[in-house]
Each structure stands twice: as C-alpha cells, then as structure tokens.
Amino acid sequence: MSEFKRIPPEQALELRKQEGAVVVDIRDAQAFAAGHITGARHLDNHSVADFIRGANLDAPTLVVCYHGNSSQSAAAYLVGQGFSDVYSVDGGFELWRATYPAETAQGAAE
C-alpha cells in the first residue's frame, strides 16, 4: 500500500495542473464557501462515499484543510480506500491563500 505525501503549496500548484488531478477541501461548509482553492471539491462525512465511488483512484488527489494537519488524516484515509496518488497540502488553505490569492474562489459547494 502506498502512503500519502506532504507537499508545499508550490508543488500543489503544479500537481493541480495535471490532467485528472482533484483537489478536495475538508474544511467546514462555511469556510469552504468563504474561500477555497479554485476548482476544489468540498468533502465531508456525508459526501465522501459518493466521492470515492466516482473517483479515479490513480488520479493525483490533493487534500486541503485549514493549516495542513487534519488533511493528513484524511489523506491517510483515502490511501486506505485504494487511492494511489494522494497528497496533503502543508499549511492548508491558509498558506495557499497567502501564497496564491489569485488561485482562490468563493461560493458554496456544488
């Protein structure tokens, strides 16, 4: 079984450009609506099963939380579910927003 990798925002920005790459944001819905990485999908306990069922388990999957701590547990969980290319973004959305403010969006999850 593979393990997830911890990466800085700079590497996440590059990985995000790969075809099929997915960014999942595990923060609460209100925080997600207030701001998230452009193109990110909100993931919570209610949506994770549907996400896993429809996911390409081999696609780069980047997990983001507030500061890069909770995302590590979520990334490990996804690896345990069969995902093979999982990353936890160090510094979370807070560091991403500070580093790449133009690469953020607002609005509720679809």
From Swiss-Prot:
Residues 17-105 form the Rhodanese domain. The active site is at C65. Its main location: cytoplasm. One of its GO terms (cellular component) is cytoplasm. GO terms for biological process: glycerol metabolic process. Disulfide bonds: none annotated. It catalyses: thiosulfate + hydrogen cyanide = thiocyanate + sulfite + 2 H(+); thiosulfate + [thioredoxin]-dithiol = [thioredoxin]-disulfide + hydrogen sulfide + sulfite + 2 H(+). It comes from the Bacteria. It is found in: Cytoplasm. Its EC number is 2.8.1.1. InterPro entries: GlpE_sulfurtransferase, Rhodanese-like_dom, Rhodanese-like_dom_sf, Thiosulf_sulfurTrfase. One of its GO terms (molecular function) is thiosulfate-cyanide sulfurtransferase activity. Transferase that catalyzes the transfer of sulfur from thiosulfate to thiophilic acceptors such as cyanide or dithiols. May function in a CysM-independent thiosulfate assimilation pathway by catalyzing the conversion of thiosulfate to sulfite, which can then be used for L-cysteine biosynthesis. This is Thiosulfate sulfurtransferase GlpE.
